[in-house]
């Protein structure tokens, strides 16, 4: 049995549903979901991410606009743009691509986005709803939301009796991932780079989510037989076998060594990454639906 979770295939199945719901909104209610993506500066990786998100939004039938700002843009100017988008009825989702230049306070920017349009799920109100298990009208961060669908596909929605370990404590992935697993009745441990005996902690996991941002830190003997392994890490390492100066992408998990002992595992690339973009589309669609008190897409 193939135990490698195909994130591209699963994401495409979700996008098909988003497209269908978008057509319903347009035909029945004359509503077109709209997303605004903001990028500040000229970081090449950020531009790649923004382009892929914008293309996917257009593919889904959304109104999509990109704001490409110079790295000299002031925090005040960025906040003014966000205020304009907050009041724009055509825009239902606002995304500011991170990281921002050092002179801009990231927290001020993420909290300036109206929580109803916070399709990244970073606003304190959305974080609070998630923490309090009020998920019906919360906007969930895209990567944990996508990872959770992958876990549910393997284990079902009720994770009672299962031990889950999340390696990583970021506000973007680690903490919301732990909250989602807790809401699904798993027994959850949050571990990180300073956790004592991290290998032993990981070995206890029926479900192991690696989101620490260290290439291939999770070794074969850290994972118990039959575990579900979700690799959120995206790390670029040297690949001399490809030529001088060449690199390749790897996750936080030593994939080749571990894949044979897992019940299911996500690859990098092609695992959680496509699901992140798919869930951004779901969040934008649902933000538009909620604005008009219409049913949301449930996966």
Swiss-Prot record:
Pathway note: One-carbon metabolism; tetrahydrofolate interconversion
GO molecular function terms noted in the UniProt entry: methenyltetrahydrofolate cyclohydrolase activity; methylenetetrahydrofolate dehydrogenase (NADP+) activity
SUPFAM superfamilies the UniProt entry points to: Aminoacid dehydrogenase-like, N-terminal domain, NAD(P)-binding Rossmann-fold domains
Gene Ontology BP terms: L-histidine biosynthetic process; methionine biosynthetic process; purine nucleotide biosynthetic process; tetrahydrofolate interconversion
EC number(s) reported in the record: 1.5.1.5, 3.5.4.9
Residues annotated as binding NADP(+): 168-170, 193, 234
Keyword set includes Transferase: no
Coiled-coil residue windows: none
Any one Gene Ontology cellular component term annotated for this protein: cytosol
Reaction it catalyzes: (6R)-5,10-methylene-5,6,7,8-tetrahydrofolate + NADP(+) = (6R)-5,10-methenyltetrahydrofolate + NADPH; (6R)-5,10-methenyltetrahydrofolate + H2O = (6R)-10-formyltetrahydrofolate + H(+)
Keywords of this entry: Amino-acid biosynthesis, Histidine biosynthesis, Hydrolase, Methionine biosynthesis, Multifunctional enzyme, NADP, One-carbon metabolism, Oxidoreductase, Purine biosynthesis
Function: Catalyzes the oxidation of 5,10-methylenetetrahydrofolate to 5,10-methenyltetrahydrofolate and then the hydrolysis of 5,10-methenyltetrahydrofolate to 10-formyltetrahydrofolate.
Subunit structure: Homodimer.
Similarity annotation: Belongs to the tetrahydrofolate dehydrogenase/cyclohydrolase family.
Protein name: Bifunctional protein FolD
Species, as recorded: Bartonella quintana (strain Toulouse) (Rochalimaea quintana)
């Amino acid at each position: 049995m193939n135990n490698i979770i195909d994130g591209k295939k699963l994401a495409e199945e979700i996008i098909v549903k988003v497209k269908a719901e978008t057509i319903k909104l347009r035909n029945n209610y004359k509503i077109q979901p709209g997303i605004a993506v903001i990028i500040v500066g000229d970081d090449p990786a950020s531009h790649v991410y923004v382009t892929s998100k914008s293309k996917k939004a257009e593919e889904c039938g959304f109104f999509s606009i990109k704001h490409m700002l110079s790295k000299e843009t002031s925090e005040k100017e960025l906040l003014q743009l966000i205020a304009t988008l907050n009041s724009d009825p055509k825009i239902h989702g606002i995304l500011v691509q991170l990281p921002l230049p050092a002179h801009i306070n990231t927290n001020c920017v993420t909290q300036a986005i109206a929580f109803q349009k916070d399709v990244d799920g970073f606003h304190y109100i959305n974080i609070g709803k998630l923490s309090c298990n009020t998920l019906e009208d919360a906007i969930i961060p895209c990567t944990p939301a996508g990872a959770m669908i992958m876990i549910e596909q393997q284990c079902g929605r009720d994770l009672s009796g299962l031990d889950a370990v999340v390696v990583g404590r970021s506000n973007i992935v680690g903490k919301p991932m732990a909250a989602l697993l807790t809401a699904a009745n798993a027994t959850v441990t949050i571990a990180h780079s300073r956790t004592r005996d991290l290998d032993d902690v990981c070995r206890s996991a029926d479900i192991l989510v690696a989101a620490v941002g260290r290439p291939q830190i999770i070794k074969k003997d850290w994972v118990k037989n039959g575990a579900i392994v979700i690799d959120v890490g995206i790390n670029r390492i040297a690949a001399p076998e490809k030529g001088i100066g060449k690199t390749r992408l790897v996750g936080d998990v030593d994939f080749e060594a571990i894949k044979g002992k897992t019940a299911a595992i996500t690859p990098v690339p092609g695992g959680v990454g496509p699901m992140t973009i798919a869930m951004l589309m779901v969040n934008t669609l649902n933000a538009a639906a909620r604005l008009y008190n219409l049913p949301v897409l449930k996966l």
